[in-house]
Amino acid sequence: LNYDPLTRYIRRGTWFISESTDMELAYILTKADMPGFQTIGVNSHVFTNAGATIVQEMAFALAIGAEYLDKLTDTDLSIDEILPKMRFNVAVGQNYFMEMAKMRAYRILWANIAKAYGAKEENAKMLIHAFNAQINMSLYDSYVNMLRTTTGSMSAILGGVHSFSVTPFDMVYEPSTEFAERIARNQQLILKEESHFDKVADPAAGSYYIENLTDSLVKAAWDLFLQIQEEGGYLAALRKGTIQKMVKENAAKRLNNVATRREIILGTNQFPNFTETMKSNPEAWVFEANSRRDENAEIDTIETYRVAQQFEQLRYATDVYSQNNKRPVAWMLTYGNLAMLKARANFASNFFACAGFEVVDNAGFKTVEDGIAAAKEVKPEIVVICSSDEEYGEGNALKIYEALKDKAIVVLAGNPEGTADVLKAAGMEYFIHVKSNVLETLQDFQKKLGITK
């Protein structure tokens, strides 16, 4: 039945009816004679999809579980009557070994909590239903989602969940199609019938790496759980805003990591499909965080989102613009050292393709003058200078900039010491390199080109 007013509270900021009435219903559902039914849910996936770390997700889920135990054991229910009626609904991401260790650590910690309440050994087992997290799934190059859901499924199963649902690859941007649902079913069947993932209990046991990861998660999540308990428990921490603050801070950090490509979303902020364009018109919610906050919310709430959304919005704006206008071209002006020009042209091509610009690479011009002449003939919106630092510093980059600055946006691939200062003094604005904030830089290019959301 998955009745979970405590998780609803952090999403909506309100109760179904009131705290006392909601908890009374939890008591009624737990006491009801429904063999085989888990009536009380702990939906930790909310924290996962809101940007929490694995440690935060675990600690907050355990705090919710402990809150239910505290309130229900204050009634005439025993701990051994309560535990079989509880189920944890957990989202699994793409950090393969860490997610595997997460499931193992969850079971250890919940067993410790249950035993502290005096539960029998057989009732101290955590019942986990897992499914794929949506936070890492993407709109563009969406078939990559199949790979994400497959590796996530493997992590969860090898980590020892009781049941698992594969999320259809298109679920994050449209009502799932028959094809996507069929693929999701077949992913599960392949893992069971062909790969025999259901035949071995705890296959990760004994692996030093996974055991060490598990122990690290157990310690870190337990420490944070105790911190929440010291504040008075889950509800008290919510009312103080402690939990929301931690989740939002990590969500902001993660979005920045995606913007600067410290975190890679394949097909979105790195290695995009250069030729893909959005032919349909996704609804606005696809690009927005999902807030379920009620108008009369009593506390701060959290939103779920996907880390790819800002890049997708950027690229979709280019696709929409290109329906009635020429698609902007990022043109590589390559010369000099062959290895360096190729490396920097590849970097720049991936960089600009993330915004949906048409990318044109070149094999390498014999002279700077040849490159300038070709650029004037092609008339691209963006010219990217690609060569080695040494060949930038021979006055070549400055010559290119001076020749083309009034005809295109001129960009340098790299940030060469000394030469960059000379170019900046001459008026060049854009230098793209591994430390660039890719998202903000591409947004600036769109503004200059008149592309709006």
Q: Which stretches of residues belong to each language-model region?
A:
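Gly/Pro-rich turn-and-neighbor structural signature
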Residues: 57-136, 140-144, 226
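A glycine-rich phosphate-binding loop feature that marks nucleotide/adenosyl-phosphate handling sites
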Residues: 4-8, 43-49, 82-93, 125-135, ...
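Mobile "lid/hinge" segments at catalytic clefts and subdomain interfaces of large enzymes
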Residues: 36-69, 147-225
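Intrinsic disorder at enzyme termini
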Residues: 162, 223-328
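Flexible, glycine/charged-enriched surface loops at secondary-structure junctions
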Residues: 74-85, 116-126, 194-204, 230-241, ...
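Short glycine/threonine-rich loop-to-helix capping motif typified by GTGT followed
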Residues: 52-58, 93-105, 133-146, 174-184, ...
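Catalytic alpha/beta active-site cores
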Residues: 1-91, 129, 163, 167, ...
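ATP-dependent carboxylate/acyl-activation modules
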Residues: 284-360, 373, 420, 424-426, ...
